[in-house]
Amino acid sequence: MLNIVLFEPEIPPNTGNIIRLCANTGCQLHLIKPLGFTWDDKRLRRAGLDYHEFADIKHHHDYQAFLDSEKLDSTQPARLFALTTKGTPAHSAVSYQANDYLLFGPETRGLPAYILDALPAQQKIRIPMQADSRSMNLSNAVSVVVYEAWRQLGYPGALLKE
């Protein structure tokens, strides 16, 4: 199972859409606080529809609590990929493995330097875009990367019709 990690997400409909994505792809969702909304926000519920009960969601007090809980060592982060416009390899150049962690920053500011600086260059990846584009919508970016990783893994758990 792939792991989607949202660091301090700010916009409830984006997180709701990602909850629905997790329910449909079997990904586990990790939410690192503080969140920019309350967990009972109507916009979050509306975007996620009734998929909340089908998604595996873990809340973490902060980034260090996430690393500790998931037994990831920030000095040797194994299979933790940060999505950033500052990354070099494209998301499609990674050979994904089950249980990889895909880390996304908040919508308005991206991941902080202390997180990016702790990761090796090959674990800071980007989604290719036009040169004059700043970034993609968070829920769209998560979908792009998750479906590429899931495709590489052979869509485990998916209902495929040949």
Swiss-Prot record:
This is tRNA (cytidine(34)-2'-O)-methyltransferase. Signal peptide: none annotated. It is an enzyme of class 2 (transferase). It catalyses: cytidine(34) in tRNA + S-adenosyl-L-methionine = 2'-O-methylcytidine(34) in tRNA + S-adenosyl-L-homocysteine + H(+); 5-carboxymethylaminomethyluridine(34) in tRNA(Leu) + S-adenosyl-L-methionine = 5-carboxymethylaminomethyl-2'-O-methyluridine(34) in tRNA(Leu) + S-adenosyl-L-homocysteine + H(+). It comes from Yersinia pestis. Methylates the ribose at the nucleotide 34 wobble position in the two leucyl isoacceptors tRNA(Leu)(CmAA) and tRNA(Leu)(cmnm5UmAA). Catalyzes the methyl transfer from S-adenosyl-L-methionine to the 2'-OH of the wobble nucleotide. Its main location: cytoplasm. The lineage of its organism: Bacteria, Pseudomonadati, Pseudomonadota, Gammaproteobacteria, Enterobacterales. Homodimer. It holds the Pfam family SpoU_methylase. The gene is trmL.
